[in-house]
């Protein structure tokens, strides 16, 4: 019986301030820990239980992610009784059905490819997330009536801005090329504008207001001294790939920032460094946005 939790019906309302927990177990009499890995019990009082705080990362695929290890280390280091899971789903609707059924969910991070796809499922957005048009942090709140309220935020812009700011030289870095047009690029564009840098998208297809890789002439490369890779090109396991920019036109005045952090030095960075450019990966951004996400989960 060591791996069985007995819930006596007369004790179901042990948590009047947390009706969502009581409701989640109202139909139970006996359940196994295998079904509820986040349950904690008191050995001498089988009717008393609580659910650990649950956090996680939504995305697909998640093989490249450091987030689960980052938060596991944080919980152990700071003695936080919580769990961080990878929610790896190839379908956003199925993913949200799963997440919204978790009674102990406090919040979750969002990564590729769901930073925009998750937005229709949210109850509200922070002003910054709304302005950016992408969400990478979701805060979950359970109402007294058992309803789950999901609030979308964006900590990518904080992580990116705080990470790149020390490397910027205002007299040189006035314009930026942003490679890729996904959810992360929206936060980068927003952050660059906030720092007074004029950003321009670069994509493989011609679109109004954007440059193509073929349009990166010597004049353009001389004018745009900051280049941010927001695409997954060069990410493990495809480490021999890099964005198709004219690396021979780079100079020591150029700053190349790669949101990819696995590998720690991408081919994009190596080729930039070979030309004397300043280079940086996205690992510090990951740490800073994760710290900001933690604050959002506990203040929203």
What are the roles of these predicted feature ranges?
Residues 169-174, 252:
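Short helix-loop-beta connector
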Residues 59, 154-157, 164, 173-193:
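Glycine-rich adenosine-cofactor-binding loop
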Residues 10, 14-19, 23-37, 41-46:
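Short polybasic linear motifs
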Residues 53-167:
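Phosphate/diphosphate ligand-binding glycine-rich loop within oxidoreductases
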Residues 162-163, 278-300:
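Active-site capping/gating segments
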Residues 209-280, 284:
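Rossmann-like adenosine-cofactor binding region
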Residues 110-117, 184, 232-235, 262:
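Short glycine-rich anion-binding loops that position phosphate/pyrophosphate groups of nucleotides
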């Amino acid at each position: 019986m060591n791996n069985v939790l007995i819930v006596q019906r007369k004790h179901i309302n042990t948590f009047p301030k947390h009706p969502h927990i009581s409701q989640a177990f109202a139909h139970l009499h006996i359940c196994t820990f295998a079904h509820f890995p986040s349950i904690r019990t008191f050995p001498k009082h089988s009717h008393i239980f609580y659910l650990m705080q649950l956090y996680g990362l939504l995305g697909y695929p998640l093989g490249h992610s450091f987030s689960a290890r980052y938060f596991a280390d944080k919980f152990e280091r700071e003695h936080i009784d919580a769990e961080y899971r990878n929610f790896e789903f190839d379908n956003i609707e199925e993913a949200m059905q799963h997440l919204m059924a978790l009674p102990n969910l406090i919040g979750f991070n969002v990564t590729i490819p769901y930073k925009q796809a998750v937005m229709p499922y949210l109850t509200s957005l922070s002003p910054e997330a709304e302005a950016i048009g992408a969400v990478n942090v979701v805060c979950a709140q359970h109402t007294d009536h058992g309803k789950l309220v999901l609030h979308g935020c964006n900590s990518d812009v904080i992580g990116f801005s705080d990470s790149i700011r020390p490397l910027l030289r205002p007299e040189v870095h006035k314009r930026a090329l942003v490679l890729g047009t996904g959810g992360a690029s929206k936060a980068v564009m927003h952050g660059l504008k906030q720092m007074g840098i004029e950003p321009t998208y670069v994509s493989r297809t011609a679109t109004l207001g954007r440059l193509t890789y073929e349009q990166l002439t010597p004049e353009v490369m001389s004018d745009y001294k900051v280049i941010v890779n927001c695409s997954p090109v060069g990410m493990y396991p495809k480490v021999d790939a890099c964005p198709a920019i004219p690396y021979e036109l780079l100079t020591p005045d150029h700053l190349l920032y790669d949101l990819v952090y696995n590998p720690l030095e991408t081919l994009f960075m190596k080729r930039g460094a070979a030309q004397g450019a300043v280079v940086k990966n996205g690992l510090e951004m990951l740490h800073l946005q994760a710290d900001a996400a933690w604050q959002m989960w506990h203040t929203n």
